[in-house]
Amino acid sequence: ITDSLGWVLFNIKRYQEAKDYLQSAGKLMPSDPIVNDHYGDALWKNGNQIQARYYWDYVLKLDKTEDDLKKIIKEKLIKGL
């Protein structure tokens, strides 16, 4: 639920609040690829590009990351958001 709320806030451009919720979600689910991807997105939109790339790279290393998400993450690592 925390991730979902954070993602809603992200999509309505409330990036700082989104980052806070997504950070909390990451603490609850540290190996969830979607949560870490969303947190990376929020970091990027808050001007923390280096940290965002760290989390996106981490998503690529998780065993349960699906191929479609890996492709999206690789694009983000090249182009950003």
Located regions from the model:
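Canonical tetratricopeptide repeat
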Residues: 4, 38, 72-76
